Amino acid sequence: MPELPEVEVTRRGIAPFVAGRRVERVDVRTAMLRWPVPAGLAEQLRAREVLAVERRGKYLLFEVDAGWFIVHLGMTGTLRVLPAGGVPVAAKHDHIDWIFDEFVLRFRDPRRFGAVLWHSREAGDVHAHPLLASLGVEPFSPAFDGALLHRRTRGRTVSVKQALLAGDIVVGVGNIYASESLFRAGIRPTTAAGKVSLPRYERLAEAVRATLADAIDRGGSTLRDFVGSNGESGYFQLDCFVYDRAGEPCRVCGTPIRQIVQGQRSTYFCPTCQR
């Protein structure tokens, strides 16, 4: 599933093409993704200029004068920029095309767990949309620090890894990045969130930012379907310290990496480096 780094890589790849350009038309070939595609989307966007492309958590927000169209990549979704002169014939899983003068922005999603939604300007600020309003803080924002993690986890018995994944404290720390961040911070993923000290949470906040920044620099992680807007795979997974390395020696101390299951998700950690 594309997480924050993959979505940010997509945003950075798309924004230079679409910002300041007008949508000539929208071809919607699939009316139902995770939720119904708004029936009037094509008409709403025709001849509209894209003013900006932002990201909130794992959602992409495309602003036009009348509102925002919101895209979520789901588990297998991608957005590709294709030159107008050489656009391949739409395949089975190519659900929506936004057609500009010199290129096409194509949404592909084999499993159809992604979403394309509309939020009108009359409905208010897009960040108040029901899917966005309850999200945690952005990991690169000044609001995210060890004090926030410490304060929001007091009294919580859930594991620190599951607290990171929940998304109500901080957004975008998916399964890969939670395991990697906890390794960098030296925290065992099974530790109760409410028992982690403030100094350790300060290290974890820095580790989360560093891990996500490294992943963005490497084009994200490609485990199955993800490619960036240019069709290239990410390669962060090749440099992971612990993720998907069960039984292999720790890159720091040589201890075999362990794999456990937490909340039906695989967790990887070093029993020596992480306490």
UniProtKB/Swiss-Prot annotation:
Binds 1 zinc ion per subunit. GO terms for biological process: base-excision repair. GO terms for molecular function: 8-oxo-7,8-dihydroguanine DNA N-glycosylase activity; class I DNA-(apurinic or apyrimidinic site) endonuclease activity; damaged DNA binding; zinc ion binding. It comes from the Bacteria. CDD domains: EcFpg-like_N. Its EC number is 3.2.2.23, 4.2.99.18. Pfam families: Fapy_DNA_glyco, H2TH, zf-FPG_IleRS. This is Formamidopyrimidine-DNA glycosylase. It comes from Burkholderia multivorans (strain ATCC 17616 / 249).
